[in-house]
Structures are given as C-alpha cells and as structure tokens.
C-alpha cells in the first residue's frame, strides 16, 4: 500500500533542465551519463535511448573537443531526453553546444580562464535559458586548495564550490545547481551537509567513481541514502563502472526504498529458508525479469511461508504467502485465491499485469476527466 515519505526535503530554488524541473517541490530527478565515444553518434544515441527507456530524466554527455561538440549537435537532434554537456577548460566548446541546443552546461566557471570568457559562457546560458551545473570533484581540486588543506576534505570541496558560485553571483546568474563529489562516502556526505545550509540552489547528489556494480551500488546507496534521509538532494546519479542503464535502476530503487519516488514494482521478498513452500529465489528472479517493463508503482510481497507472509501481504498491493497444499494470493490486503506451485510464476505475472492494466485505465480516466 502506498505510504507518504516522512522525509522533509530541503527547500531549494527550482531550475529547468530542458522540460524537467529540478529543485523546489519537483520530484527528485534520476540521471546517468553516457560512456560511449561522443563522436560515435549512432552508439551514443542508442545508449541514450536505452537510458531513457530505463526511466532516466536527464543524461549527461562528455564533450571534450570541438569535434565532439559537432557530434553532440547531431545527437541532440535524435533524442528527446534533456542533455547536459560535460565540459572542462575550453569555453568555446560551451558556446558551441549552447548554439546546438544543450539543456544544461556542466562547467566550472573558475576553470575556463579570463573573465571575458566566463562572461561569454554565462551570457550564452542566460540568453538561451540554459542552467549551469557546478561540479566539484575531490580528484580535481584546485592546486591552491590542495596546498591549503593538504588533502581533499569536505571544507575544501565546499570552498571550491563557493569560489565558482561567487563568479556566477558577480554576473547575477542564479540558474545553477551544484554537486560536491568524492569517492569516499563520509567526505561526500559531510560536504553536502555543509553547503546545503549556505546556498538555495538545487543539489545534484553522487558518490563519484564509486566502483563496479556491487561495490558502487553499496557506496551510493549508503551515501545518497544518508543525504536523502536528511532531505538533501534534488537530482541523483549512481556512478557505476557498469552499464548506465543499471545506474537508473539502482537510482530508482534508492528513491523507492525511501518512498521519495516510485517507478515500477517494489518487491518485498523473504530470503527463504527451509519453511518455504515454493522456491522464493527462483520465483523472484523470474518475476523481476518478466515484469521489468512495468512502470506503474506497486508493492508486491513474495513470502515463502505463513510466519511473516500474511502480515506482509496485508500491507502490500499484491501478496503471496507460501502454504500447503497451495499458496495464498492476496489482493489489496485480503485473501483472493489459491495458487498452485506448478503454474505459480505464470499465474502471478498474469494477476499482476491485470492489476497494472486496471490502474493504468483508472489513471487514464482521471486524466481524461480533468481535461474535460
């Protein structure tokens, strides 16, 4: 059953990244980054569409050269997802992608040279309503801050961000968001907590270079989870050395677990033991694979025996409790019918999809009525 999150989110200024609101009372946006060669337009477009299909709100694309900038323009024409151009040092690249339809510039003003270059980039962004993302990373702190602090610290990350923010403030440019990333969880969390009370702009959360799929998922879940529990964060990226599609799935799972945003089925399942009356693990693997295309939010409890099964099933939208000789299927918290092990997965998929269709029809009717 759907429950509201008890988390009180930090108040932030809202900006628009393409057609996606970020900050304010907007849903927390989930984003990823392509790992293709940007100059390979076809490969990059294919990956962006896969990321979008997984549910991403925004995608970032690295643009390291003018050749990549021209490729970015071709990519922009073939995808509908808001695109952030990741640019370092060369202000001309920023000006070019602004002309080509970028939705957000990830560029640190202090890294692009003379004030006239900074002014040119900010003017281009202002004229086209393009927000800027200030992205501070522990691995690329300014040398002066490295000397001052000796090593990356939360305070160093915040000071770096504030230097870039001061440049935007001098140009009266307020449409920006900020990220403060490190590969170390405690440092990242401390840095975000420090800056959250100092600025009103939205914050993009991430644990940078978190690692492969397993270790990166764990680090990101802990770090992002701690901040989100504090109400901090307006957009997130789970950085994994893995398929970017997996970043989106893990990102939504983090938000889903905190009841901040839901997409698809939220499975509740026991780890199984000798009391199970059906193969819980295989059933879960099959259902997750078969129902991966479902976007409708729903809690589904799959519990192998009667110890915890009835209690979990009663508070889920759909539930299954293992039993003998047959398993008991619950709908909206109430016993509905009994299911045989021989056809269990097929029956569950059918019943879940029927409920998904009913909810989608109900939502469509509400939308149609509101537009009359």
UniProtKB/Swiss-Prot annotation:
Binds 1 [4Fe-4S] cluster. It catalyses: (2E)-4-hydroxy-3-methylbut-2-enyl diphosphate + oxidized [flavodoxin] + H2O + 2 H(+) = 2-C-methyl-D-erythritol 2,4-cyclic diphosphate + reduced [flavodoxin]. One of its GO terms (molecular function) is iron ion binding. Its cofactor is [4Fe-4S] cluster. It is an enzyme of class 1 (oxidoreductase). It comes from the Bacteria. SUPFAM superfamilies: Dihydropteroate synthetase-like, Nitrite and sulphite reductase 4Fe-4S domain-like. Keywords: 4Fe-4S, Iron, Iron-sulfur, Isoprene biosynthesis, Metal-binding, Oxidoreductase. GO terms for biological process: isopentenyl diphosphate biosynthetic process, methylerythritol 4-phosphate pathway; terpenoid biosynthetic process. [4Fe-4S] cluster binds at residues 270, 273, 305, 312. Disulfide bonds: none annotated. Its EC number is 1.17.7.3. Pathway: Isoprenoid biosynthesis; isopentenyl diphosphate biosynthesis via DXP pathway; isopentenyl diphosphate from 1-deoxy-D-xylulose 5-phosphate: step 5/6. Coiled coil: none annotated. Belongs to the IspG family. Converts 2C-methyl-D-erythritol 2,4-cyclodiphosphate (ME-2,4cPP) into 1-hydroxy-2-methyl-2-(E)-butenyl 4-diphosphate. HAMAP family: IspG. This is 4-hydroxy-3-methylbut-2-en-1-yl diphosphate synthase (flavodoxin). It comes from Marinobacter nauticus (strain ATCC 700491 / DSM 11845 / VT8).
């Amino acid at each position: 059953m759907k429950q509201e999150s008890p988390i009180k989110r930090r108040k932030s200024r809202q900006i628009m990244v393409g057609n996606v609101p970020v900050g304010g009372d907007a849903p927390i946006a989930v984003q990823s980054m392509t790992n293709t060669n940007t100059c390979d337009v076809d490969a990059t477009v294919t990956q962006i569409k896969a990321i979008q299909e997984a549910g991403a709100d925004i995608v970032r694309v690295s643009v390291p050269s003018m050749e990549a900038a021209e490729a970015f323009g071709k990519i922009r024409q073939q995808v509908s997802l808001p695109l952030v151009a990741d640019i370092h040092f060369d202000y001309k690249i920023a000006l070019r992608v602004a002309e080509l339809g970028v939705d957000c510039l990830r560029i640190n003003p202090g890294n692009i040279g003379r004030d006239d270059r900074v002014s040119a980039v900010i003017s281009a962004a202002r004229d086209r309503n393009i927000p800027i993302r200030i992205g501070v990373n522990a691995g690329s702190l300014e040398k002066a801050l490295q000397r001052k602090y000796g090593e990356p610290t939360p305070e160093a990350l915040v000071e770096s961000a504030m230097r870039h923010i001061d440049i935007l403030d001098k140009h009266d440019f307020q449409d920006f968001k900020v990220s403060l990333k490190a590969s170390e969880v405690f440092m990242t969390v401390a840095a975000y907590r420090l800056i959250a009370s100092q600025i009103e702009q939205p914050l993009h959360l991430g644990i940078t270079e978190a690692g492969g799929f397993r270790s990166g998922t764990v680090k990101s879940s802990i770090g992002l989870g701690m901040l989100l529990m504090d109400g901090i964060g307006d957009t997130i990226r789970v950085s994994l050395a893995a398929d970017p599609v997996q970043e989106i799935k893990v990102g939504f799972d983090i938000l889903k677990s905190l009841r901040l945003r839901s997409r698809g089925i939220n499975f509740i399942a026991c780890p199984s033991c000798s009391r199970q009356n059906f193969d819980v693990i295989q059933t879960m693997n099959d259902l997750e694979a078969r129902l991966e295309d479902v976007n409708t939010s729903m809690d589904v409890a799959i519990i192998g025996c009667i110890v915890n099964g009835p209690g979990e099933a009663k508070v889920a939208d759909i539930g299954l409790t293992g039993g003998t000789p047959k398993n008991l299927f619950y709908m909206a918290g109430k016993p509905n019918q009994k299911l045989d092990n021989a056809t269990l997965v097929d029956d569950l998929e059918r019943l879940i999809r029927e409920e998904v269709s009913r909810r989608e029809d109900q939502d469509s009717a509400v939308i149609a009525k509101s537009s009359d």
